[in-house]
A protein has these predicted regions:
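Conserved N-terminal entry element of GNAT/NAT acetyltransferase domains
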Residues: 1-27
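A conserved beta-strand-loop-helix scaffold within acyl/acetyltransferase catalytic domains
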Residues: 23-101, 133, 233-244, 250-256, ...
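Conserved acetyl-CoA-binding loop-helix of GNAT-fold acetyltransferases
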Residues: 99, 105-120, 127-130, 257-266
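Conserved GNAT acetyl-CoA-binding A-motif
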Residues: 120-133, 271-281
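Conserved catalytic-core motifs of GNAT/GCN5-like acyltransferases
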Residues: 131, 144-170, 300-311
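Short, cationic low-complexity segments
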Residues: 193-225, 329-360
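Non-catalytic interaction/regulatory modules that flank or connect domains
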Residues: 201-304
Length: 360
């Protein structure tokens, strides 16, 4: 059992801060909400977190484990959550680490992350998962020190006109997230059906995670037929109308894949700020065929979501009309090389979409 703990911290001026790191207790709700409001005002994308009753019920139902950093005078200096996704996914996400501004600069983030990871490791999860922001790299660096490794990006998730925070956005109009992973119970990714062009990237990610994996020898695309495909794809989707973000998950590719994708694009046209991210099961032997279809429709490779469920996923994105300024992202040195590769994939995709270059 992981016990609550006290940590003593100093800022650069020599001021000390004694904080108790612990699990949520009833009565913490208003203090946690105050942390959110101090940074985001009323614009935090997890709107339910402004509701004290939601925090109580999610904690009671064990869907979300809320954690608190409490000062000597009983004020909540910071909050964080551990969120599980059973039965769809077997990982646990460490997320929503938010501090009141007056308690920043003491180095509280690292011990708080480490405390959360200890709680997480005490359970049987396939992986620890985090989506750090890209408007600063503090979280990325601290998670790396804690053992999480870079795997890619989920682009254009949140409309920056609808979120207020205390960091610079640069020229981007939508906020993107990085993907960081630590392997826990899942130690074998199985056989991966990935395009040859992305296998070097994927190999680096899986090797950094220290798990077993293998690449299936890719057939020539012309050899991939539909005769051995199932009739119907297994796909799910959700669209966040507030953030103009469509998320598609493809568990199985069938003959109807392109038709169903086109129908989704008709339902949620990629105009104005509407964008789409797609998670493609790359343990499916038809993933390469699906990738070729997606590439022709304006999607490009942005990384991997590994070890989070029974299946492995590559991540793709269609920015629609949204311009992406990768140079304005704030990323750690570990993410920098991955970002350069994703930027290359984006520029190649844009050339294809606008007829400025050759396919591939």
């Amino acid at each position: 059992m992981v016990k609550e703990r006290k940590v003593k911290l100093k800022n650069k001026n020599g001021d000390t801060l004694l904080v108790l790191l612990r699990e949520y207790r009833k009565g913490d709700e208003e203090g946690m909400i105050a942390c959110i409001r101090d940074e985001y005002g009323e614009t935090y994308f997890k709107r339910d977190f402004y509701d004290p009753e939601y925090i109580k019920s999610e904690s009671d139902n064990h869907h979300i484990k809320f954690l608190a950093a409490q000062t000597e005078d009983k004020e909540i200096a910071g909050m964080m959550i551990l969120k599980q996704f059973y039965p769809e996914e077997s990982m646990c996400e460490i997320a929503s680490q938010i501090f009141r501004k007056k308690y920043r600069g003491y180095g509280l983030a690292l011990p708080f992350f480490q405390y959360g990871l200890e709680l997480l490791k005490a359970r049987n999860y396939s992986a620890a998962y985090c989506l750090p922001v890209t408007f600063h790299h503090i979280t990325q660096v601290l998670l790396y020190r804690s053992g999480l490794r870079a795997a890619g990006f989920i682009l254009n998730v949140f409309d920056l006109d609808k979120i207020i925070h205390s960091y610079e956005n640069g020229r981007n109009t939508k906020h993107s997230q990085a993907i960081q992973i630590m392997a826990l119970d899942k130690r074998d990714a199985g056989t991966l059906y990935l395009p040859v062009e992305h296998q070097k990237f994927a190999g680096m990610v899986y090797e950094s995670l220290g798990v077993n994996f293998s690449f299936h020898k890719e057939k020539m695309i012309s050899e991939w037929g539909e005769s051995d495909m199932p009739d119907y794809s297994d796909m799910t989707f959700s669209n966040d109308a507030v953030q103009s973000n469509l998320e598609i998950r493809v568990l199985l590719v069938g003959r109807d894949f392109k038709k169903r994708l086109l129908n989704l694009h008709r339902q949620f046209p990629l105009c104005r700020k509407q964008t789409a991210s797609l998670f493609l099961n790359c343990n499916d032997c038809h993933a390469v065929k699906a990738y070729e279809i997606l590439k022709k429709m304006g999607y490009f490779f942005t990384g991997l979501k590994p070890l989070c469920s029974e299946k492995e996923y590559m991540v793709l994105h269609n920015p629609g009309k949204v311009q992406i300024y990768f140079d304005d992202y704030m990323v750690s040195s570990e993410f920098a090389s991955l970002l350069l590769y994703v930027k290359y994939c984006y520029e190649r995709s844009q050339n294809m979409v606008f007829g400025l270059g050759k396919d591939g």
